[in-house]
Amino acid sequence: MLTIVYVLILLVLILMLFTGIGGWIGAGRLLRITDVWYVVTLRLSGATEETVTLPRQVETAYDGIFGIAWQHDYAILGKIVASDTQTVTRRIIKTTQPLSAGLLVTWNIFVYQGDPQRTLGLAYDDVRIPSELGPLPAWLVPGERTTWVLLVHGFHAPREEGLRILPTLAQMGFPVLQLSYRNDAGAPRSPDHLYHLGDTEWRDVESGVRYALAHGAQDVVLYGWSMGGCMVETFLRRSSYTAQIRAVILDAPLLDWHKAIDTQMHKLHFPHWFTYVVEWAAALRAGINFAALNHERPARERTTPTLLFHGTADGMVPIGSSDTFAQAQPDLITYQRMNGVDHAQAWNADPQAYEDAVKTFLTRETSDKPVSHGEKSST
């Protein structure tokens, strides 16, 4: 009998050991710095002067505006004009070089590749934002207004994520600061060389706000995609500059890391409890406070007008978090719930509707009335 007990104890210890190792590896994949997270590579099936045919897969089957890139060139593709079980044919809106069958390309949900001048013909300055870790590279597109817009890209996404909405913001006269943050390419590394999932990165958003205020901004609109949305919401809870935030725009914001990680664990056929193991390992490795990064239910003192986009087909960040978030403050949050749209692709699905929503919201919230929300002031 005693032998059986010892065997059971040994089996439990072995199970705990392997579970801990698995959680440590999972946390490492989540926190490890990499310039490329997920790249979809395609070989073109065919092309004409007006259309391009691609292999049919989940990414290429979504209707809307998308991009492809190869070497130093790119093309912007329009809506689907034909499809079958094997291929999808799209209209070519723009291409920097002729396309041909067999060309190896990467799929680009951000549509544009390059800086604002090269891709959109918008003049900009390369600036460096002082931060606690060193200078952060940023693009500054000038404008005549005293309200600046600060764009915060998502997890493993490039600054180009914000280029889709940049022409709209520039047309409205806003100075736009496209920020990079710690561990981005060209930006300083965090001391432990790990991502902190917004728990420390929000301070780089604060550095961007401080820079804007020091260079003529009277107030700021924060605009975040995915983890950038988590960083914006963390800023609103922790920063001493919240009184200077005029409004917020969130696109597929990551408001609850537990649910986002659990979604990916489910896809990989791991049990629900393994999500907690990964979080435990991530907290141990990087000191992340996951409870403090849960923004699904806004703090009572949160009084910032917000425009929220989220797609019902989001496979990365569950839309339920945005549903709960919007329901908590219906008087402050204007919710654009996009049917059948994947992660951070609301603009791609319907650019005109997306841009109209942004224009309407910013026109309403950035008139010449003073900022009246928020109880904190800058120090």
Describe each model-derived feature in a short phrase.
Residues 301-302, 308-310, 314:
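Short beta-strand/loop motif that positions the catalytic acidic residue
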Residues 224-228, 232:
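Gly/Ala-rich beta-loop-alpha elbow adjacent to hydrolase catalytic centers
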Residues 234-289:
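Hydrolase active-site cap/lid region
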Residues 341-352:
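Catalytic histidine-centered segment of alpha/beta-hydrolase-like enzymes
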Residues 135, 141-182:
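Short, surface-exposed "cap/lid" segments of acyl-processing enzymes
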Residues 195-215:
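Alpha/beta-hydrolase active-site loop
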Residues 1-119:
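N-terminal targeting or regulatory segments adjacent to alpha/beta-hydrolase or S9 domains
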Residues 318-327:
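Short alpha-helix in the alpha/beta-hydrolase fold that links the catalytic acid
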